[in-house]
Design a protein with these regions (language model features):
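Elongated, mostly alpha-helical coiled-coil "stalk/stator" tethers of large membrane protein machines
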Residues: 1-294
Length: 294
């Protein structure tokens, strides 16, 4: 099973509650249909059929009969799983759902993973969470993830506790819940909990910053990180977003990191584009000139 699909499945099953047993049954029935119905198997495992078309076949076949969660999960799997691996992937989904059904109310902790695999799982999980939100709610998640990344960046003790896999997951999740409960949206807490149980906590700050970027992409926007010695007001942020949007030909959402070391001016990053208009840079260049002339 692709890590992307596994992450999406984890998000679907997290919110299933008493419907998990039904999902297990429906996944099993679909897996059996792939075995017994040649025409269905041929269409869904044909790599020349467009992924969106494979997804549409699943949705048309199951919509109105199976639960909405099952339809979403199997449609996503048909779209993103390698066509030749669809049947084994569905079988793996049955096993995953059975694990969740056997431990109701418990979060399924993922096995350890490398950076790429962990990011793919998290992207799949976030895809499902964002599907359930409107644009304003996605914006709020992005804001809260950014605030959390800044808090972790400046609070080493908190970062260490949350990243320490020798501490049981439930204890670390409790710390996170105490921190966010009543302050953050349920979707933010849900994503943050998955980060802790996703098999890789080595770079929590970078991971939460990446989620901010995913939230921006979900709205068809680019993320701009701006480092400034002082906070920017609403009007300044709006002007900056407009100017950067013209530059990259996309709508831009701006997140500001207050960094006194820039002295003055701004350091702007939009993907690979970096614009350094800081006083710090000008001072460094002046020092270089003075060093050469002495």
């Amino acid at each position: 099973m692709r890590d992307l699909v596994r992450g999406y499945a984890a998000a679907v099953l997290d919110g299933a509650g008493p419907d998990t047993g039904r999902i297990v049954s429906e996944l099993g029935s679909f897996g059996a249909a792939l075995v017994h119905f040649d025409a269905l198997r041929q269409v869904l495992t044909d790599a020349t059929v467009a992924p969106a078309s494979r997804r549409a076949v699943v949705v048309d076949l199951l919509g109105g009969r199976d639960s909405a969660r099952t339809v979403a999960l199997l449609g996503f799997t048909a779209h993103y799983e390698h066509a030749s691996e669809l049947a084994p992937s569905v079988a793996a989904l049955v096993g995953l759902a059975e694990q969740v059904a056997a431990a109701p109310g418990a979060d399924l902790v993922e096995p350890p993973a490398g950076r790429s695999a962990a990011r793919e799982r998290l992207r799949g999980y976030a895809d499902r969470v964002f599907e359930e939100l409107d644009d304003a709610a996605v914006d709020r998640v992005g804001d809260e993830m950014f605030a959390l990344s800044r808090l972790l960046d400046r609070t080493e003790s908190l970062r260490h506790v949350l990243a320490d896999t020798d501490v049981p997951y439930r204890a670390r999740a409790a710390v996170l819940e105490d921190l966010l409960a009543g302050r953050a949206a349920p979707a933010t807490l849900r994503l943050a909990r998955y980060v802790l149980r996703n098999g890789r906590t080595r770079d929590l700050v970078g991971t939460f910053e990446w989620l901010v970027e995913l939230a921006a992409r979900e709205r068809g926007m680019r993320l701009a990180e701006v480092r400034s010695a002082v906070e920017l007001d609403t009007a300044e942020l709006a002007r900056l977003a407009t100017a950067l949007g013209r530059l990259v030909a996309r709508r831009v959402t701006v997140r500001v990191v207050v960094d006194p070391t820039v002295v003055g001016g701004l350091l702007v990053s939009v993907g690979d584009l970096v614009i350094d208009g800081t006083v710090r840079l000008r001072l460094e260049r002046l020092r270089d000139v003075l060093a050469l002339s002495s």
